[in-house]
From Swiss-Prot:
InterPro entries on file: Pancreatic_hormone-like, Pancreatic_hormone-like_CS
General function of this protein: NPY is implicated in the control of feeding and in secretion of gonadotrophin-release hormone.
SMART domains attached to this UniProt entry: PAH
Residue numbers of Tyrosine amide PTMs: Y36
Listed name of the protein: Neuropeptide Y
Record GO cellular component, one term: extracellular space
Protein location: Secreted
GO terms of biological process kind: feeding behavior; neuropeptide signaling pathway
Superkingdom to which the source organism belongs: Eukaryota
Keywords: Amidation, Neuropeptide, Secreted
Main location: secreted
Family to which the UniProt record says this protein belongs: Belongs to the NPY family.
């Protein structure tokens, strides 16, 4: 199973948050693809 991305926290810089959210979206896509 893929590793869940680490949440950078509320006070993280915007680019860190953007990187986290794209990684999280990719992670969710991987999991949902495996399930179906």
């Amino acid at each position: 199973y893929p590793i869940k991305p680490e949440n950078p926290g509320e006070d993280a810089p915007a680019d860190e948050l953007a990187k986290y959210y794209s990684a999280l979206r990719h992670y969710i896509n991987l999991i949902t693809r495996q399930r179906y």
